From Swiss-Prot:
It is an enzyme of class 3 (hydrolase). This is Ribonuclease Z. Zn(2+) 2 binds at D67, H68, D212, H270. Its cofactor is Zn(2+). Belongs to the RNase Z family. Zinc phosphodiesterase, which displays some tRNA 3'-processing endonuclease activity. Probably involved in tRNA maturation, by removing a 3'-trailer from precursor tRNA. It catalyses: Endonucleolytic cleavage of RNA, removing extra 3' nucleotides from tRNA precursor, generating 3' termini of tRNAs. A 3'-hydroxy group is left at the tRNA terminus and a 5'-phosphoryl group is left at the trailer molecule. It comes from the Bacteria. The active site is at D67 (proton acceptor). InterPro entries: Metallo-B-lactamas (IPR001279), RibonucZ/Hydroxyglut_hydro (IPR036866), RNase_Z/BN (IPR013471). Its EC number is 3.1.26.11.
Length: 307
């Protein structure tokens, strides 16, 4: 599991930062990539990374402001043009379906793979399978905006091979049956319960990716005990009133959410273009005063998520 930040700026592109898009690479877990937001030129940013459009399985949109969605039509079309055939699902607030369908229709863009568009109308679970569970809550951003909590389900423990070898069970088809938790009988009549030969499960990771938002309770709830919290930091602490007026957060407010939620790690993104050069480091300094395990994303930077 790895983050690749494709765009870390706020509102409009700048020379140093493109607008919002985050790839969550799940190559080891499911051989796929999930994308969170898709601002303009996202597909161009992808060219400079290891992200492959054909591997993008899901796109989660936080809200419908242009700096989070204007790259969608181009990416969807290019994925088809480049030979993508596997299904893709887009999740987002009401209106995302109309935006995509009109853009593709007017531009006569033909998508040759199965494309599903899911409009989120209420908080709660938006996706779940045997590996992951994705929950969402409304944030505070003036228009409908969602944050996402991605929960990796616990992974079954490893088969205790040494324990089996000690009692004379040799590698073979029996190992798989025991790994599956079956009760098996050996040739000598011994009964073995597979569950007795499986180690403790590996706890799944929790990732929280928030859209644009003021400081709000929903952010804390989504981030509770997260392994990684990705939070916007559009403004410095001295501009807290401006952040409130424009439905955004300061770096210090992001750190406060991470602290309250008992998150393990905080990554700041959505940085205003007013912070050029190294001036953005002041945002990092302010956040670390409250929450030491804070990092600030820059375009094309990757962050592995270890167990």
């Amino acid at each position: 599991m790895e983050f690749v930040f494709l765009g870390t700026g706020a509102g409009v592109p700048s020379k140093g930062r493109n607008v919002s898009a985050i790839a969550l690479q799940l190559l080891e877990e499911r051989g796929q990539t999930w994308l969170f937001d898709c601002g303009e030129a996202t597909q161009h940013q992808i060219l400079h990374t290891s992200v492959r459009p054909r591997r993008i399985e899901k796109i989660f949109i936080t809200h419908l402001h242009g700096d989070h969605i204007f790259g969608l039509p181009g990416l969807l079309g290019s994925r088809s043009f480049q030979g993508g055939t596997t299904p893709l699902t887009v999740y987002g607030p009401k209106g995302i379906k109309q935006f995509i369908e009109v853009a593709l229709s007017v531009s006569t863009t033909h998508v040759k793979y199965p494309l599903e568009i899911v409009e989120i109308t209420e908080e709660g679970t938006v996706f779940e399978d045997n590996e992951f569970h994705v929950e969402t809550k409304r944030l505070s951003h003036g228009i409908e905006c969602f944050g996402y909590r991605i929960i990796e389900k616990d992974i079954q423990g490893a088969l205790l091979v040494d324990k089996l070898l000690e009692i004379g069970v040799k590698p073979g088809p029996l190992f798989k049956r025991l790994k599956d938790g079956e009760v098996v009988e050996l040739e000598n009549g011994t009964i073995l319960n597979g569950n007795d030969f499986i180690g403790p499960p590996q706890k799944g990771r929790v990732i929280t990716i928030l859209g644009d938002t003021r400081y709000c309770e929903a952010s804390r709830e989504l981030a509770q005990d997260a392994d990684v919290l990705v939070h916007e930091a559009t403004f410095a602490a001295e501009d807290e009133q401006q952040a409130y007026d424009y439905f955004h957060s300061t770096s210090k407010q992001a750190a406060s959410i991470a602290l309250q939620a008992n998150a393990k790690r905080l990554i700041l993104t959505h940085i205003s273009s007013r912070y050029q050069g190294d001036t953005y480091k002041e945002l990092l300094k302010e956040a670390r005063e409250l929450f030491s395990n804070t990092e600030i994303a820059t375009d094309l930077k990757s962050f592995p998520v270890d167990r």
